[in-house]
Amino acid sequence: MIIFDKPSISPIKTKAMGRRAQLGTDATCRQSVMYDTYRMTARDIVLFLFVFLSLLSCTSDNEPSVTTTNRQTVTVAVTPTLDCLPFLVARDCAIADSMGIELVLIECGALADCDTALISGHASAIMSDYVRAASLRDKWARLMTSQTAGEKQKRTAGDKTVTASVDSLVVFPHQNSHLYMFVNRKSRIREARQMADKMVAVDRYGADAALAAYVLDSVGLTGKTYLVQMQNINTRVMMIENNMMDVAVVSEPYATLLRKTGHKQIYSAAHVKSENVGCLIARKNHQLIRDMYNRACDSITKNGLHHYDSLLIRFSGVPPKAVETMPRHKFLHLE
């Protein structure tokens, strides 16, 4: 009988087989780790794409629309007076935005600065008065004449890049600006006929001087009165507050400020219905600016003047107590 024993395996072969088994196990582990790593990376990529698309959708919602990016820029020069309040309301209460307008306000201390901004082209429109409007029309006519002559000379010289100016000056009268004449509280003046040899702070090239001349002529004043040129309305108020002027012509809200501090009002143009002291002068975008101003006037009429006290306080620098006691004003549309 032949008996076959189990083949004996030498220690060397056993060691080699163990190493191969270990290598096989390591390879399997590496494949598993690589698979796990690949699976985690794919998961991260999917998560990243989800977050990215979410952010992209949010960004697209916040991006301005086509109408917003194509908004028309309108620059208006204003003074710190009540008749300019509709432009503040249009800018800060989204009226201009709703009309597709990017409204930029140039804050000037005097109407003369507004005239300069309009003539130089820095402003599309300004708030002014009827006296300055007449003077500005003459300046504008001379400016257009000189520009036309210069353009003709350049065309004659062969410059084909010259184009004619398309801007035209349009004046819109309004009744939202009223002038008041005040006498210093320490003065003995009680009425206009006592203003002989007195100094009156006015803008000599504006409606202020016209009002002062009208008041003095209406009482038949025989003595001489000195109209002192002070274009900046804040300077006028400061001079009469410091007792350096006898009389000053101002508009709201500075008229209320002088009343609060004890100065005497001797004339008011607020109750003269035919008095169109103020006006808006535009050189471009005429109807667009007119419609924006009128919409803001409707908003003030609807909500009340004192709803916008904070805008007027910040704009004019008049103390809150004076602005809060200012009489009610009805804002009318531009004519």
Give the ranges of each region predicted by the language model.
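Sec-dependent N-terminal signal peptides
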Residues: 45-53
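Sec-dependent signal peptide cleavage junction
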Residues: 60-70
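Bacterial N-terminal signal peptides that target proteins for export
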Residues: 24, 34-46
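Secondary-structure end/capping motifs
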Residues: 287-335
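C-terminal motif of bacterial Sec signal peptides marking the signal peptidase cleavage site
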Residues: 56-57
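Short, glycine-/small- and polar/acidic-enriched structural segments
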Residues: 69-222, 227-230, 246-252, 265-269, ...
